[in-house]
Swiss-Prot record:
<keyword id="KW-0479">Metal-binding</keyword>
<dbReference type="InterPro" id="IPR001199">
    <property type="entry name" value="Cyt_B5-like_heme/steroid-bd"/>
</dbReference>
<dbReference type="GO" id="GO:0005789">
    <property type="term" value="C:endoplasmic reticulum membrane"/>
</dbReference>
<keyword id="KW-0349">Heme</keyword>
<keyword id="KW-0249">Electron transport</keyword>
<dbReference type="InterPro" id="IPR018506">
    <property type="entry name" value="Cyt_B5_heme-BS"/>
</dbReference>
<feature type="transmembrane region" description="Helical">
    <location>
        <begin position="108"/>
        <end position="128"/>
    </location>
</feature>
<dbReference type="InterPro" id="IPR050668">
    <property type="entry name" value="Cytochrome_b5"/>
</dbReference>
<keyword id="KW-0813">Transport</keyword>
<feature type="binding site" description="axial binding residue">
    <location>
        <position position="45"/>
    </location>
    <ligand>
        <name>heme</name>
    </ligand>
</feature>
<keyword id="KW-0256">Endoplasmic reticulum</keyword>
<comment type="function">
    <text>Hemoprotein that functions as an electron carrier for membrane bound monooxygenases involved in sterol biosynthesis.</text>
</comment>
<dbReference type="GO" id="GO:0046872">
    <property type="term" value="F:metal ion binding"/>
</dbReference>
<comment type="subunit">
    <text>Interacts with alternative squalene epoxidase PHATRDRAFT_45494.</text>
</comment>
<keyword id="KW-0812">Transmembrane</keyword>
<dbReference type="InterPro" id="IPR036400">
    <property type="entry name" value="Cyt_B5-like_heme/steroid_sf"/>
</dbReference>
<dbReference type="GO" id="GO:0020037">
    <property type="term" value="F:heme binding"/>
</dbReference>
Amino acid sequence: MSAEKEYILDEISQHTTTESCWLIIGNASNGGPKVYDVTKYLDDHPGGAEVMLDVAGQDADEFFEDIGHSKEARAELKNYLVGNFKIDAATLAKMKADAEAKAQQKNSGTGIMLIVLMALFAIAYGYYQTQMK
């Protein structure tokens, strides 16, 4: 298949099984999102097939980058390139909404942690004060 072919999310999201496993990896800073058919690599992946199947049919760039793959792994990935990820208006809107929801979810956890930390500090300070008397 030509690396020039473009795929939309609806097409990519149909490839989520051991028979056909596609991933979107990449961003604007490294040549744009690309589509990879990693089906033949599932059994050879050091982290196991399940890791890739968990993010199959979707944007897996964050997961790929968080792992810190080696230069060799990045070079190997090029063997599975099938095309470019074409972001249409509907997909872009969905991706933005998902990113905002994820950021909001992340921030809500931070607020709770801060409250718990402050409460623990107040309890520890109160205990310290009673012991000093």
